[in-house]
């Protein structure tokens, strides 16, 4: 066989192999590559969506956290205001109660002072009558001299 015939036969076999490969082998390979590329693209798209959703969720969480912090700060401020109001009310009531107690004590002391003065006047009047009795060596009649004794009490 000559070199030309061998070369020609190999060329024919090569083209038959190429045609067979293009017809039967190449389509499943390209289909598998296309499916793989599609899966990779879907995976990347899903990753991008997940990344976007994560960013959105993080934003919502931050907003909720800020809202909760604001609400807690507001509640704390309200509690402090209520505590101050309660303390101020207690101080006011204590001051009023103290004023009432002081007023009652002053009133009681004034009454005791008036009673003590009245008792002292009566005692002084009785002593004055006794002294006058002894000076005069006679008995002074309280009923007869009631006007004189009452004037003496008021002067003392």
Curated annotation (Swiss-Prot):
Keywords: ATP synthesis, Cell inner membrane, Cell membrane, CF(0), Hydrogen ion transport, Ion transport, Membrane, Transmembrane, Transmembrane helix, Transport. The chain crosses the membrane at residues 7-27. CDD domains: ATP-synt_Fo_b (cd06503). GO terms for molecular function: proton-transporting ATP synthase activity, rotational mechanism; proton-transporting ATPase activity, rotational mechanism. GO terms for cellular component: plasma membrane; proton-transporting ATP synthase complex. It is found in: Cell inner membrane. Pfam families: ATP-synt_B. SUPFAM superfamilies: F1F0 ATP synthase subunit B, membrane domain. It is a single-pass membrane protein. F(1)F(0) ATP synthase produces ATP from ADP in the presence of a proton or sodium gradient. F-type ATPases consist of two structural domains, F(1) containing the extramembraneous catalytic core and F(0) containing the membrane proton channel, linked together by a central stalk and a peripheral stalk. During catalysis, ATP synthesis in the catalytic domain of F(1) is coupled via a rotary mechanism of the central stalk subunits to proton translocation. Belongs to the ATPase B chain family. HAMAP family: ATP_synth_b_bprime (MF_01398). F-type ATPases have 2 components, F(1) - the catalytic core - and F(0) - the membrane proton channel. F(1) has five subunits: alpha(3), beta(3), gamma(1), delta(1), epsilon(1). F(0) has four main subunits: a(1), b(2) and c(10-14). The alpha and beta chains form an alternating ring which encloses part of the gamma chain. F(1) is attached to F(0) by a central stalk formed by the gamma and epsilon chains, while a peripheral stalk is formed by the delta and b chains. This is ATP synthase subunit b. The lineage of its organism: Bacteria, Pseudomonadati, Pseudomonadota, Betaproteobacteria, Burkholderiales.
């Amino acid at each position: 066989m000559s070199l030309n015939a061998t070369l020609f036969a190999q060329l024919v076999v090569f083209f038959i192999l190429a045609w067979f490969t293009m017809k039967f082998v190449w389509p499943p390979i390209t289909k598998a590559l296309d499916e793989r590329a599609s899966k990779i693209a879907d995976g990347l798209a899903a990753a991008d969506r997940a990344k976007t959703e994560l960013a959105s969720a993080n934003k919502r969480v931050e907003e909720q956290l800020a809202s909760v912090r604001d609400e807690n700060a507001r509640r704390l401020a309200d509690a402090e205001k209520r505590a101050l109001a309660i303390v101020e009310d207690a101080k006011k009531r204590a001051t009023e109660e103290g004023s009432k107690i002081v007023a009652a004590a002053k009133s009681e002391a004034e009454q005791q002072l008036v009673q003590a003065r009245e008792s002292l006047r009566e005692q002084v009047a009785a002593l004055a009558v006794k002294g006058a009795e002894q000076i005069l060596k006679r008995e002074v009649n309280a009923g007869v001299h009631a006007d004189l004794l009452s004037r003496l009490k008021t002067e003392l």
